[in-house]
Amino acid sequence: MFMKSNAVPSSYVTLRPRYIPYWPLWLGLAACVVAMVWSSFIVPVIPDFACLSTIGLDGLALAMAVMVMPRHFVIGFLASLLPFMISWRVAAIHGSVPGMATSTVAFMIYLMLYVDCMVHDRAAGWNDHLQWQTATIRIYFGFDMVGHFAEKLFAGVHSFHHMEQVFVGFGFPPDGQAVIAGGLCELSVAIGVGMGVLTRLAGIGGALYYLIANHYGRHFGDGFTWNNAPVGGWEYPMLMIVAFASFAIAGAGKFSIDGWLIAHGWMPRFLLPLCVSDACTHVQRDARRSA
């Protein structure tokens, strides 16, 4: 362990918003739940199990925001943001205007909380500024996978069967197993990279997944530029591969599940190489201050 688990890591004291309260997000997420109920049962545009996905995921996001975020901002923020993003994506797939509108407002509140937290932490020094740069890029690239796995796993029967036919075009059998496997891989990358859970392992996994997926997508045979005919070149796939692989170098940084667990001394030692290349700088600094 890097430090005693009952100590409060000093670098995490400032990792919370200073000016933006939590209650606007609670109201925003509650409005999202109401909007998803409306679009599922009152004016039903969200079909079959997708209605359970949107309502349940927004409910989970609200629970994390209310019960966890005020006490442990990093954990609560990341654990709330991912299910919210999935629900937002499913609402957009099915054209739920109330769902998209309320989700847009809620997302702006998430963004304000994140920026407020970053500004609150600004006195930490240039190294921590780089940590915020890394965190922003990591969260974006990790949660970019939401747009891919949501339509495979959470958007309903019609969306699943559509993706099943897409995978048939890639040469897979029409049994849906490849759709489920691909969706679970993408969900794992979103959790691992976006939330920062075993980030080095997730970065390697994400890079390998994109390498394999885009082999089947035949992008590597269409040149470099993404808008090349017929399916687009390898510009975008290579961007994703390099981005994911880069997180295998040093891990996620402090605004992550890995960073939080390591700083509190709760990450098992045998998992540390899958999270960070060495003791994080903010963990080393906290250890010196607590000595």
Annotate each language-model stretch with its function.
Residues 2-154, 176, 180, 198-291:
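Extended, low-polarity transmembrane helix blocks
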Residues 127-128, 159, 166-169, 189, ...:
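A generic structural signal for ordered alpha-helices
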Residues 185-190, 240:
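Core segments of transmembrane alpha-helices
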Residues 163-170, 181-184, 208, 261:
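Hydrophobic alpha-helical segments of integral membrane proteins
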